[in-house]
Amino acid sequence: MPKQLSFSNESREALEKGINTVANAVKVTIGPKAKNVVIERKFGSPDIVRDGSTVAKEINLDNPISNLGAKLIEQVASKTKESAGDGTTTATILTQIMVQEGLKNIAAGASPIELKKGMEKGLNFVLEKLRSKSIKINGSDIKKVATVSAGGDEDIGSIISKAMDIVTSDGVITVEESQSLETELDITEGMSFDRGYSSPYFVTDQERQICELENPKILITDQKISTLTNLVPILEEVQKSASPFLILAEDIEGEALTTLVLNKNSGVLNVSAVRAPSFGERRKAALEDIAILTGAKLISEDQSMKLEEVTLNDLGKAKKITISKDKTTIVAFDDTKDLVQERVEKLKREVEITESEYDKDKINERIAKLAGGVALIKVGAATETEMKYKKLRIEDSLNATKAAIEEGVVSGGGQTLIEISNELSNSRKEISDDLTTGIDIITNALLEPTKQIAKNAGFNGDVVIADIKRLGKGFNANNGEYENLNESGILDPTKVIRLALQDSVSIAAMIITTEVAVADIPEPEAAPGGPGADPMGGMGGMGGMGGMGGMGMPGMGGMGMPGMGGMGMPGMGGMGMPGMM
């Protein structure tokens, strides 16, 4: 594909245009008086969102170089979302102002490299001050953080606070859609562990990049699976039952993984595969815990159990399993509650007789996972659009609350960033060089989130900043008053602010040091088929793939591709895949 090249100021200006386009759409979503963004969907009703990452992902620009800028700032939002679960709009706002200030100084003759060094030096100062101002969160603060992150919605704050109180920080909280109009909290058995899907092709929700299995059957084994030959009998039985299927094994690789993906994508079997958590002997213990939770039999090599002898009675079950790229959450049925409690009591006895502190810690971790349970927040709404909106707000609020528990909180509303900006300004050397200018870029950027919060609430951002500095109090955008934001319960998770700063400086520094941008030139869309083309003519079909022992993929022969008449590909009939074919 031909490439478009852009150099020097031209490339940076085009990148900045893309960054500004995305940032201007995103920054209306910050603060308690934030505005919504409506996103058209190809199918179904439009989405109404107030989440920076979601908005940024939807924007594509005609100019290839500007679109690179749009994708770079979208990367900032996505990375912050992935790491902290919140703070995407703050990260976007910071990136935009840093890029604007950086490019303005470069146009005036500043050295990009020295600016970058100054920005990184300023960032280190800010992070050190941020850590010193952070305070540990207590029970009453959880509701405050959740409420602020939910845009001031006290109902969301209350339900998250209640869920946290019941399952504790070791438990699991999941958010799902409800059939009723009310948002409810339900506590059930379950656990999560740090292993994700073995292949991204198992994803069922492309937007959230997760795999969800409703009422699945579960095979649990400590064996490595590299071929599905031994699993054909049980796979056929599961297919007949029309249930989703999860394979939890020491490893799933090679031909076995390829064949599962093929069957998943062809609609033959709704399946996913996950590697077992932990390592060595602890891996088997973890699998035993999961087997008890789900009512499964652990198919173990130690007991000479063979995969080809597995029956439906050996499989476990769950209400729902959610798998991301690095985490699996199991929502179990309550009928295993007594068995789980017995297991917990047994583990507690092991703790008492174990001498190794390390082993005690590991056993206590298992107890916490089993006993913590799962809190289900069931989101109710009158319409599908409202449902999606509320669910996204609750997920953001939940992520922010977890981040607050991890690293503590600071004064919200951008107040802490303003304080640090003043401290950074006061520490500035009275010299004029490019490195110092880079520090100044950070100093000024720290004011921008509060300016935008004020603007979204209908106030002049510059006036609000001046009043905050004069009064020594924070700005409460809910009521337009200047207050002690800690006492008002307006708190931000330290982790969210830290990651927003780190991610924004990282991308902004890369952009201002960019000299050349290379992008694909979009090819013009050709008319379907072309003159005289047979619309149904096409590539000779792929002949039917060999049967899969009852689970065969339907043959694909004869499915011509429109517009490519006369270019037949030789059939591939009879090429059965090994194992289940």
UniProtKB/Swiss-Prot annotation:
Subunit structure: Forms a cylinder of 14 subunits composed of two heptameric rings stacked back-to-back. Interacts with the co-chaperonin GroES.
A Pfam family of this chain: Cpn60_TCP1
GO BP field: protein refolding
Positions that bind ATP: 29-32, 86-90, 413, 492
Annotated Gene Ontology cellular component terms: cytoplasm
Family, similarity comment: Belongs to the chaperonin (HSP60) family.
Record lineage: Bacteria, Bacillati, Cyanobacteriota, Cyanophyceae, Synechococcales
Catalytic activity: ATP + H2O + a folded polypeptide = ADP + phosphate + an unfolded polypeptide
Identification of the protein by name: Chaperonin GroEL 1
Subcellular location: Cytoplasm
Function according to Swiss-Prot or TrEMBL: Together with its co-chaperonin GroES, plays an essential role in assisting protein folding. The GroEL-GroES system forms a nano-cage that allows encapsulation of the non-native substrate proteins and provides a physical environment optimized to promote and accelerate protein folding.
Coiled-coil residue windows: none
UniProt keyword annotations, A-Z: ATP-binding, Chaperone, Cytoplasm, Isomerase, Nucleotide-binding
CDD domains in the cross-refs: GroEL (cd03344)
NCBIfam families: GroEL, PRK00013.1, PRK12849.1, PRK12850.1, PRK12851.1
Annotated gene: groEL1
GO MF annotations, alphabetized: ATP binding; ATP-dependent protein folding chaperone; isomerase activity; unfolded protein binding
EC number(s) per entry: 5.6.1.7
InterPro entries, per the entry: Chaperonin_Cpn60_CS, Cpn60/GroEL, Cpn60/GroEL/TCP-1, GroEL-like_apical_dom_sf, GROEL-like_equatorial_sf, TCP-1-like_intermed_sf
